[in-house]
């Protein structure tokens, strides 16, 4: 091979390598996202509607889920990469070997999670629910806290209250109005909408019993193969959280538009009131890790349905590095 031919081959190889790098850099990052239909999904909705993800170079394919555990199951099926779920299904998933990791705290949602009855009901507190039917989503942190903390605080045992499974929050209000159930565990925006329409009233909320963290999780596959996509997602998501905390009225307006697109005519003030009941604290703090350990121990004890075999290795299940990177300078 002559020097001339060798130089030509080297030049061609460099062109191919550079072309591959440039092509990879020009292709947008992509994730498949599960968006919660309750307020835990608001940052995602805002980031999508305001174009925050696109501005981070991220292409998002998204779908709605009524429960965090439904999104978790979609992760298991390989259908989505990012999803937020409550601590109970998160821990149960870890126990079952679901390959995912928590990278942030979506929210603390106890203030928006309520026990509601019909507006004309003669039930005024949880102690009056003995022998009654309370619509609840099974296999969730709401069920776990209701059975393990709320009922005992009123001297009631889990078996003394019927808890028919109504997974989708939007179906619990019709069941309540039709008197198929006597009460329901319900979260916003459905509580705020039901109050506004004069259909229900609140008799208790969950903050007296538990702060109810919601965990933001990603599959281990995307964590390994596309960490930059996860960071881009977190940057867009954090911008939405910032809007919620610093410009709540504007954030409420964006989410009100989303509700209108779903056929729900709700005043901005109603949505604003509901959103202010949420707490947005993204960091996985030592207190959150301790909370997860304590709840895992309770689930191992197996006092209610949904128990787990062992306390999972949370050191492997929690990743704080990507959120730190997303918060940092580019």
What are these regions (language model features)?
Residues 25-159, 163-166, 172-175, 182-188, ...:
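Short, glycine-/small- and polar/acidic-enriched structural segments
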